[in-house]
């Protein structure tokens, strides 16, 4: 019972029985790795259950407790004393709860304290990470280059230069572009449900693709959007490249909440490898800050960009779409302002780089260049060279979901592994968007 998925649904009584069985076993050895790991897991679950204010148990909290307990756990067999340290400031009530669950043993739970370090070490540690230093770095980045997508493109070039596999290139590019374009956390991209992908008609950008994620930091669901961007950072093209070379990933258990979600979108380990890559390969001061934002670079960059563009009302200080709906978690409510499922279409018009605010202001947007605009639904369905076999269609009058289905697309086999998870209509749209985008690029080069 050493993994979160196995232990999360145990009752306190079941946890206590498991612990008693281990401690009373004839072969019990506190130093045996497997036994120590099981006990740390069970005591972590008991600890989380003791904190009754928590409405759900999350895997990251479990890992934090398990690490501290596993390193500090000791057992005096003669006097039946169990001792361990946990990452809490006050442990009196927790100690009483565990003693009541294990009446045959004396339990000593100590609060976690950092090891004593010298004055010089403390000085070095406090200067490794500084929030104001991080903010200053993002301000400096945007002072040198006002076009946010040129900044992103410069970083994405390192993926092409230094990534060994096409899979890693596609993963890193999708993570970077998706986090910037949605001002979201890595976990929002990772946890989005592929089965919820749908086509949505943005009133400025035309048909785009979006999916829902419910496991956000605030536990308020939101959309993750993939849409056209002026330049070489098109989120729909990035999505196409990812689906071409990456396989579906089964959903990992991240909390004790029941869910019918069968797949997640990004690998669990991607944030770690992505952060390491940025530190080693990208010559940008912000990536050299110890414990600074790397997998969260995108949301920090977009939050700073919108704030400097007088659009700060759309983001919280920590970089998520702002909203005023109630957030369940008290901690999240204190630190994260995300409370909106949807975002105004005008926000994406501005971010995309295709539009600018009209001189009249009041967030009225017009095309920067009428000859350079996103692919329209008519262009995607035009008969000339159209493998969809569908007649031209008029766009819907309201920017709601595009209900008209695309007919069978010969490129659908490119995404065969996603068939049955992402709807064929969405996969067909992505394939056709990529094809028409390529044709337009070729015409532009010839011209």
Curated annotation (Swiss-Prot):
Keywords (A to Z) from UniProt: DNA integration, DNA recombination, Plasmid
Pfam families xref list: Flp_C (PF05202), Flp_N (PF03930)
Gene Ontology MF term list: DNA binding
Active site: 336 (o-(3'-phospho-dna)-tyrosine intermediate)
GO biological-process terms attached to the record: DNA integration; DNA recombination
Record InterPro entries: DNA_brk_join_enz, Integrase-like_cat_sf, Recombinase_Flp_C, Recombinase_Flp_N
Transmembrane residue ranges: none
Domain Tyr recombinase Flp-type: 130-417
Domain of life per record: Eukaryota
Annotated region (Disordered), positions in chain: 376-401
The family this protein is said to belong to: Belongs to the 'phage' integrase family.
Role according to the record: Catalyzes the recombination between the large inverted repetitions of the plasmid.
Name used for this protein in its record: Recombinase Flp protein
Organism: Kluyveromyces lactis (Yeast)
């Amino acid at each position: 019972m050493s993994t979160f998925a196995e232990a999360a649904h145990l009752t306190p009584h079941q946890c206590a029985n498991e612990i008693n069985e281990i401690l009373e076993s004839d072969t019990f050895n506190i130093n045996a790795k497997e036994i120590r790991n099981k006990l740390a897991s069970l005591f972590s679950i008991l600890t989380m259950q003791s904190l009754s204010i928590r409405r759900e148990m999350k895997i990251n909290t479990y890992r934090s407790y398990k690490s501290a307990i596993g390193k500090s756990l000791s057992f005096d067999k003669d006097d039946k004393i169990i001792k361990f340290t946990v990452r809490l400031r006050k442990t009196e009530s927790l100690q009483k709860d565990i003693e009541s669950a294990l009446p045959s043993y004396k339990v000593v739970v100590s609060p976690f304290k950092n090891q004593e370090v010298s004055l010089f070490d403390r000085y070095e540690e406090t200067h490794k990470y500084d929030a104001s230093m991080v903010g200053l770095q993002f301000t400096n980045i945007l002072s040198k280059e006002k076009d946010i997508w040129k900044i992103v493109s410069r970083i994405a070039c390192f993926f092409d230069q230094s990534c060994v596999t096409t899979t890693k290139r596609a993963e890193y590019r999708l993570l970077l572009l998706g986090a910037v374009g949605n001002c979201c956390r890595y976990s929002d991209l990772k946890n989005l449900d592929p089965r919820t992908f749908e086509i949505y008609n943005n009133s400025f950008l035309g048909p785009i693709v979006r999916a829902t994620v419910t496991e956000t930091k605030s536990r308020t669901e939101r959309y993750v959007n993939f849409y056209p961007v002026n330049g070489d950072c098109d989120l729909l093209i990035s999505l196409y490249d990812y689906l071409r070379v990456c396989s579906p990933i089964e959903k990992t258990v991240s909390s004790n909440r029941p869910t019918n979600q069968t797949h997640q979108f990004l690998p669990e380990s991607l944030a770690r490898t992505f952060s390491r890559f940025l530190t080693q390969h990208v010559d940008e001061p912000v990536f050299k800050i110890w414990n600074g934002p790397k997998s969260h670079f995108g949301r920090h960059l977009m939050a700073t960009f919108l704030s400097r563009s007088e659009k700060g009302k759309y983001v919280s200080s920590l970089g998520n779409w702002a909203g005023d709906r109630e957030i369940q978690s008290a901690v999240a409510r204190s630190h994260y302002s995300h409370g909106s499922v949807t975002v105004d279409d005008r926000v994406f018009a501005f971010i995309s780089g295709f539009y600018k605010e009209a001189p009249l202001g009041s967030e009225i947007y017009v095309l920067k260049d009428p000859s350079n605009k996103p692919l329209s639904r008519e262009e995607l369905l035009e008969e000339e060279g159209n493998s969809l076999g569908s007649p031209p269609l008029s766009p819907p009058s309201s920017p709601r979901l595009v209900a008209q289905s695309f007919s069978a697309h010969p490129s659908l086999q490119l995404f065969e592994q996603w068939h049955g998870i992402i709807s064929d209509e969405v996969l067909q749209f992505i394939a056709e968007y990529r094809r028409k985008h390529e044709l337009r690029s070729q015409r532009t080069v010839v011209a």
